[in-house]
Amino acid sequence: MPIEKRRWIPTALLSSVERLVKIRSVSREKDWKIRISSSLRVSLKIMTSFKWRGSFSWSQRLATCGDRSIDGDFENVDDYSLYEGMKQIAKTGKVLAIHAENAAVTDRLGEIAKANGETTLAAYVDSRPVFTEVEAIQRAILFSKETGCPIHICHVACKEGVDAVVKAQEEGINVTCETCVHYLYFTKDELDAIGPVVKCSPPIREQAQKDALWQRVEDGKVAFVTSDHSPCTPDLKDTDNAFDAWGGISGVQNDVDVMFDEAMQKRGMALKDFAKLIAINPADRYNLTQKGRISIGKDADFVLIKPNAPYTLTADDLEYQNKISPYIGREIGAQVVQTILRGQTIYSQADGVTADFPGQFIK
């Protein structure tokens, strides 16, 4: 979720957002959106002023993605603010995207683990048990039912979370969910061998959870699969204590090739279903009317993938400013060879990322 350069938005002034739009519009290759996570009331005012097309986003959890206190990072939202915000958002018809974890429990469990001298990623996972994720999802669903606010549960890491969403859908509640590539790729038992670079929140769980998530993805119960790209500078991952490391994964560059390999090449997923997971469903849910489909009148956005072309990811392959990724050293069975945005090539294997084609701000 966080942006890579930590350009925090002073949400007290709408002009700050307008200024950021101008800055980013001349410096980014891809189309992009803003996530505002400060004062609830001010965030709503800014988004309404911009006639926001997509979604609102708040976090039902910690002020950071780990136990490290980082000035300016995302803040937790209390229940009343969430409830009031959802009542206001319901009037707009927009979707509220929620990071769902029970911070009251995970904070305390993390403190106890640290006090007991725990330092491993396995212990970090244990400090964020499944029920803390599920309880927050169920609470968000209840608030959605009471307020009529459409919601989307971000980065679900457990089968119980998906099942709660499916049950709510059957009751007529407007809720969807996603999972992430890393929850479908890694497992808890390999985390400590990889190191803090693979720490995230909610955490990567056991093999049984991974298998169950895959089943729900294949059954169409998960709306889309994302990267939850959450980069940081290397120093925030450079620690022997997992509880002190930044809790986020840099994954957006390998979201498509890893998922293509795992879903289509290894599990036989149909191309049309793959396209729904990574393009069609996200565009539909967030009302990105020009995106998600190859169709006359829509933006000509394409990604060209070379199948059955394994390669081993290295740090030199990464286009990130901070070249860290849990996928480094992994063999990926497909390659993204070209990316086209509105009919123009913005990336190719031969030339890398273009330097002269700015993206656009999508309101």
Where are these regions (language model features)?
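C-terminal cap of metal-dependent C-N hydrolases
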Residues: 241, 296-362
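Histidine/acidic residue-rich metal-binding segments in metalloenzymes
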Residues: 63-225
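Divalent-metal coordination cores built from histidine and acidic residues
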Residues: 1-105, 109
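Glycine/Thr-rich phosphate-binding loops of Rossmann-like dinucleotide-binding domains
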Residues: 106, 162, 185, 233-235, ...
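Alpha-helix termination/capping residues and helix-transition junctions
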Residues: 56-59, 148, 219, 333
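His/Asp/Glu-enriched, well-ordered alpha-helical/loop segment
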Residues: 119-150, 197, 218-219, 223-225, ...
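Short, glycine/acidic-enriched loop or turn micro-motifs at the edges of active sites
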Residues: 102, 158, 181, 231, ...
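Short, well-ordered secondary-structure micro-motifs
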Residues: 50, 108-109, 187-190, 236-238, ...
